[in-house]
Amino acid sequence: YRSSRGLGDVYKRQNLNSIRDSYDDSILTPPDLINECYERIEKDSKDKIWISLRKRSEAIKIAELVSISSRKNKPLWGIPFSVKDNIDVEGLATTAACPKYSYFPEKSSPVVQALENAGAICLGKTNLDQFATGLNGTRSPYGVCTSVFNDEYISGGSSSGSALSVAKKQVCFSIGTDTGGSGRIPAAMNLSL
């Protein structure tokens, strides 16, 4: 994949240092990178990675605000990430892959708030085995997450959407949970380590 501005080559590496260098050299801006992410998300829209996704326009507005803010003490300035949908993000429903459980939190969880304070940009909430009780990525009413390598194989779970959002380079990193392999298994099965 290569965008018209050639940003795809930078983002393919998905290396935070490369992205920071591209920001420093004015080759890339946070809104550019967010657009790249959404192009990848739209390209892979058949995959059941996302439960709730910020509107592109909203994410770009956040990226524009980040762009004009100081980078001092913000090691994740302009870096997009996703969050497993059992962790609260202000403005996005938390479902734990159970629609009847759905609620809108009043504020983001401390980990999400800390990442945003460090300059990171949350794009949305990812699919998981319902209530994070599974290790294969197939126990969600929002659809089955499949392997990044072959859609006839499972992705692993329960942090399946988190691992796939990174493996498919839709975001640079993701926050998941792990009690008995829920993060490690899908990360290993999809080379998201």
What are these regions (language model features)?
Residues 12-179:
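Gly/Ser-rich catalytic/binding loops embedded in alpha/beta enzyme cores
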Residues 183:
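A ligand-binding cleft/hinge motif common to bilobed small-molecule-binding domains
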Residues 189-192:
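Mobile "lid/hinge" segments at catalytic clefts and subdomain interfaces of large enzymes
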Residues 1-11:
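Single conserved hydrophobic/aromatic residue that forms the stacking wall/gate
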